[in-house]
Amino acid sequence: MDEDRFHIEVSKALSSCQLVEEVLKLYISESYELARKCIDGKLVFKLSGEDVEDASLERLITTFRKLTDNEKLVAKLNKFKSERNYLSHKAIAHCLDPMGNLDWGYAGELKKRLDRIQQDSHDLRLEIHEEAKTFRAHLYF
């Protein structure tokens, strides 16, 4: 793997993390829409998807946890958050030697984590989508 390929792999993994965030935002937005529909003017309800538009992954998970009983999925999301935080804040720095060049030994090890992050992201997106099926039909009918 050359340096350009390494950076592409890191970018793909980070992009997959962003997709998890987007799916969580959609779940939260649709949950709020259903709540608004059920409340139907009986109570002021001003929560909306805009409230989480710029939210961190941690805040999205905290909000999601309040809208689901699926603690197993919440636990997976928290584990994923730890890996995503490592990737976002530490992984690339750990791949650099003191001169700022890529340490190929560590970069090779990181590649395994990047692949796992992408797979976990895919699996989580599917699980969140499945969780949304529990209420989505009520939103439109």
Where are these regions (language model features)?
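Amphipathic alpha-helical interface elements
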Residues: 1-55, 71-72, 78, 89, ...
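Short amphipathic alpha-helical segments at helix-loop
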Residues: 1-5, 65, 106-109
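N-proximal short alpha-helices
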Residues: 50-53, 57-60, 94, 101
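Short, solvent-exposed, charged loop/turn and helix-capping segments
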Residues: 59-74
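Generic secondary-structure transition motif, activating predominantly at the C-termini of alpha-helices
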Residues: 64-68, 81, 118, 122, ...
